[in-house]
């Protein structure tokens, strides 16, 4: 999956080079990845077994969506969930490595975003109106981890501790991290 992501990232750079960078946020890179790999036949350069193409296509398409369609089941759902976990773990490590991605502001977090977070739900990017809410959105991604292995990795590598260390206003985000740490530990021991 990482190989596909690297290839898609390179093709994505080529694709958007002709556009204003403000367009980048409006392009769904999961859908673009599917288009680049399958519509242009690039998949043949990486993988030959056409029996797996639909699983690969769905995994790439849904790795960055807020959820996977309910009617995707069996091996196709497992492949989607593996890709989603891998993508989120990469994002968490990127947030730790590049501290400037966790930028804060002086705004309060809206009631809707707060409620969604404390109900252990993913937050839709369209509902985000501030840098602080973007941090909460990033934290809510932990709710969409699908495998015990992924939760164990989060706990063993102390990802939450490292992210909390990067936050400047620890008091503002303390309850979010405490709640999330409790949820992650529970899921790590129960899955």
Question: What are these model-predicted stretches?
Answer:
Residues 25-70, 75-81, 85-89:
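Histidine- and acidic-residue-rich, metal-dependent catalytic cores
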Residues 3-4, 8-19, 24, 65-66, ...:
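Divalent metal-dependent phosphate-bond-processing catalytic cores, especially two-metal-ion Mg2+/Mn2+ enzymes
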Residues 1-14, 31-43:
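Extended cationic-aromatic binding surfaces that line active-site or macromolecule-binding grooves
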């Amino acid at each position: 999956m990482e190989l596909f992501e690297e290839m898609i990232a390179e093709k994505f750079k080529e694709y958007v080079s002709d556009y204003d960078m403000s367009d980048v946020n409006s392009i769904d890179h999961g859908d673009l990845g599917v288009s680049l790999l399958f519509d242009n036949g690039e998949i043949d350069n990486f993988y030959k077994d056409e029996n797996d193409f639909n699983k690969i296509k769905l995994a790439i398409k849904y790795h960055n969506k807020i959820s996977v369609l309910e009617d995707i089941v069996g091996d196709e759902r497992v492949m989607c969930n593996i890709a989603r976990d891998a993508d989120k773990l990469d994002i968490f490590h990127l947030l730790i490595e590049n501290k400037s991605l966790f930028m804060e502001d002086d705004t309060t977090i809206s009631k809707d975003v707060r409620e969604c977070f404390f109900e252990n739900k993913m937050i839709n990017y369209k509902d985000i109106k501030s840098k602080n809410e973007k941090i909460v959105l990033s934290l809510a991604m932990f709710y969409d981890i699908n495998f015990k292995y992924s939760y164990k990795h989060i706990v063993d590598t102390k990802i939450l501790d490292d992210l909390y260390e990067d936050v400047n206003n620890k008091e503002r985000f303390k309850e979010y991290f405490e709640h999330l740490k409790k949820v992650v530990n529970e899921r790590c021991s129960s899955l």
